[in-house]
Design a protein with these regions (language model features):
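Juxtamembrane intracellular "pre-TM" segments in multi-pass secondary transporters
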Residues: 140-170
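A late C-terminal transmembrane helix in Major Facilitator Superfamily
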Residues: 280-320
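Cytoplasmic helix-loop-helix junction between adjacent transmembrane helices
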Residues: 52, 58-99
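Residue-level signature of mid-helix packing/kink "hotspots" within the transmembrane helices
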Residues: 9-17, 67, 101-102, 210-214, ...
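Paired small-residue
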Residues: 38, 42-45, 53-61, 259-265
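Conserved MFS/SLC helix-loop-helix module at the cytosolic interface between two early adjacent transmembrane helices
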Residues: 13-52
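Helix-loop-helix hairpin linking two adjacent transmembrane segments in secondary transporters
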Residues: 54, 91-137
Length: 349
């Protein structure tokens, strides 16, 4: 099952590389609609799959719906006049998105326990259909100037990759998210093996830290326009670094507990809620004409890096491990954000 998740994330990263520039060519709306249609069809196929092999193959197709996550950010950038305004709106969008990882593990665990694994996919199908209907009637086209060809749009990748500020903001977003991906990769092991949390309760413990992410995005939504993207990213990474440092210190001195571990991740989530939307908005503001391409490339790097860190977390946590290796990995990931954003500020002067 872990293999299916890794495969899903890999396909998701590739999809975003393609669909980002494609959205700058054909527009945002068509890709969102067809991505949701494919998501619903592939979900039905997964429900009626007859073997593990079929499940693994079909599991990758819902990854195309990651397009909606990327394009929602591009749509926000299309409809705003500045990076600060985009950061504020992206924060509110992400705040709503954070509800899913907060309640998803607990709901999925209970559906699986009481009904069976297909119940999770039936729930996803109903949600997918509902979002498809809403998007069909409510999402308009926001792309102002479309590209002439897909090859022309792909050709903007080298320009973005040569931009030092793009890389600085991209690394900021990827490493901040990477700390959370590391947590997702290692938290089930730490919760069950280190702290002895029962499987029925584990989903709740793992999902609770998303509360911090919700509040962090709320703060970004309220203050990004007043303070600016760079200052918000600096404040966010400082808060995240404080949270993971406190938990790491307690664990090193033998004072770690489930409350200190999962509680610290709430603080990390609070900081990430300020870091990720503002670094993403700044990344897309480097050249607004290729906002979709920048969003796709940045998100692909973020997901790819996050999947790698999640795999590292699984690798370093072996039977008999404490929570310390995971906290060290999270600390390193968060710390890298600091020099990256400072460099972005320096290059922007």
């Amino acid at each position: 099952m872990c293999f299916s998740v890794v495969l899903y994330l890999a396909i998701r990263a590739v999809v975003q590389l393609i669909f980002g520039p494609l959205s700058d060519l054909v527009g945002r709306r068509p890709l969102i609609i067809w991505s949701l249609v494919l998501f619903c069809i592939s979900t039905v196929a997964i429900i009626f799959s007859q073997s593990a092999g079929q499940f693994f193959v079909l599991r990758v197709f819902p990854a195309v719906c990651a397009t909606c996550m990327v394009l929602s950010r591009a749509i926000v950038r299309d409809t705003t006049d500045s990076g600060q305004a985009a950061g504020s709106r992206i924060a509110y969008v992400t705040m709503g998105m954070a509800i899913v990882p907060m309640v998803g593990p607990a709901m999925g665990g209970r559906l699986d326990s009481f009904v069976g694994w297909t119940a999770v996919w039936w729930a996803l199908l109903y949600l997918g259909i509902a979002i498809l209907v809403i998007s069909f009637f409510d999402v308009g086209e926001t792309m102002r100037t479309k590209s002439k060809s897909f090859s022309e749009q792909i050709s903007t990748y080298p320009m973005l990759l040569r931009s030092k500020r793009f890389w600085a903001y991209c690394i900021s977003s990827a490493c901040a998210s990477g700390a959370f991906f590391s947590y997702l990769g290692g938290a089930p092991f730490v919760g069950s093996e280190v702290f002895g949390i029962a499987p029925r309760e584990l989903g709740i413990w793992v999902g609770i830290p998303a509360i911090g992410y919700v509040f962090g995005n709320f703060i970004s939504g309220r203050f990004s326009m007043k303070i600016g993207n760079d200052i918000m990213v600096l404040l966010g990474v400082s808060i995240s670094l404080f949270g993971v440092s406190m938990s790491l210190s307690l664990s090193v001195f033998g004072l770690g507990s489930a409350i200190s571990f999962f509680g610290s991740v709430i603080v990390v989530g609070l900081g990430n809620g300020m870091t990720v939307p503002n670094s993403t908005a700044a990344m897309m503001s480097i050249n607004q004409k290729v906002a979709g391409t920048a969003a796709g490339l940045g998100s692909s790097i973020m997901i790819g890096g996050g999947a790698s860190l999640s795999a590292v977390a699984n690798f370093i946590l072996v039977p008999g491990s404490s929570e310390v290796p995971l906290l060290v990995l999270m600390w390193i990931s968060v710390f890298v954000v600091l020099p990256a954003v400072l460099y972005a500020v320096y290059r922007g002067k």
